[in-house]
Design a protein with these regions (language model features):
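Helical segment within the ABC ATPase nucleotide-binding domain
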Residues: 188-201
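The feature captures the beta-strand-to-loop junction immediately N-terminal to the Walker
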Residues: 34-39
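Helix-to-loop junction immediately C-terminal to a conserved catalytic motif
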Residues: 52
Length: 254
């Protein structure tokens, strides 16, 4: 083991005869902004799913802050400080913006909030949960929309809310799966500014197809193709790697 906040060792995921993730070794350091790129079908989202517990790997190990979490369910990984946003917006559309954030905040105050009916009590009975919720709403600039249903928000604001939901769990590491997908250039800039602002003190692992954006924000980049690590290094090193250029320009697909 190293001092990495996240480490995968030989992580492999097979679906029948298809190997979607193939012996991936990955180490994300504390405070690092790491990006994972690769052609469509390279195994990026499957890798995220194995790290977050949405899928169990066929082989290999996932370590988080020195603990083997390979077999832990997703909610236990969240409690340990691992957060994730999804490629497709993942909010409770019928609930108010405040309630979306509050439900996430409850996960880090769970010992204070005992009982099966906790989520239905008045928010003022939660003490720290209510204060934490309001703080998150302020940080993501959605306090003025707190009592609106999430489904009424503009798309960019729904993505902003999703980042707030992740932030509310107070994660040490955040996995961001194409957080700017479907956005205009202006929305993309605003979303990345928000991420770099409110998540600046966390370790970040990003999947993103906008290569210019990746080159701008990343400390290091890992390139996947056919489920394997093709290259890893600084943005300058990746930009100058012939194998990486061939993988993209050569149209490698699965």
């Amino acid at each position: 083991m190293t001092d990495a906040v996240l480490e995968t060792d030989g992580l492999t995921k097979r679906f029948g005869e298809l190997t979607a993730v193939d012996r991936v070794d990955l180490a994300v350091e504390a405070g690092e902004f790491r990006s994972v790129i690769g052609p469509n079908g390279a195994g990026k989202t499957t890798l995220f799913n194995c790290i977050t517990g949405a899928l169990l790997p066929t082989e290999g190990t996932v370590w988080f802050r020195g603990e083997d979490i390979t077999a832990l369910p997703s909610h236990e990984r969240v409690r340990r400080g691992l957060g994730r946003s999804f490629q497709i917006t993942n909010v409770f559309g019928g609930l108010a913006v405040r309630e979306n954030v509050r439900l996430a905040a409850q996960s880090i105050f769970r010992e204070e909030i005992a009982g099966r009916d906790a989520m239905f009590r008045d928010k003022n009975s939660f003490g720290d949960v209510a204060a934490h919720t309001d703080e998150v709403l302020d940080r993501i600039d959605l306090a003025s929309h707190a009592d609106e249903r999430a489904e009424t928000l503009a798309y960019g604001d729904q993505r902003r809310l999703e980042i707030g939901i992740v932030l509310a769990t107070d994660p040490d590491l955040v996995l961001l799966d194409e957080p700017t997908a479907g956005m205009s250039s202006e929305e993309t800039r605003a979303t990345m500014d928000l991420i770099e602002d409110v998540l600046a003190d966390r370790s970040l692992l990003l999947i993103e197809h906008d290569i210019d954006l990746v080159m701008r924000v990343s400390d290091r980049i890992t390139v996947l193709t056919r489920g394997e690590v093709l290259a890893e290094g600084s943005p300058d090193a990746i930009a100058g790697d012939d194998d990486v250029r061939d993988a993209y320009l050569g149209g490698v697909r699965q």
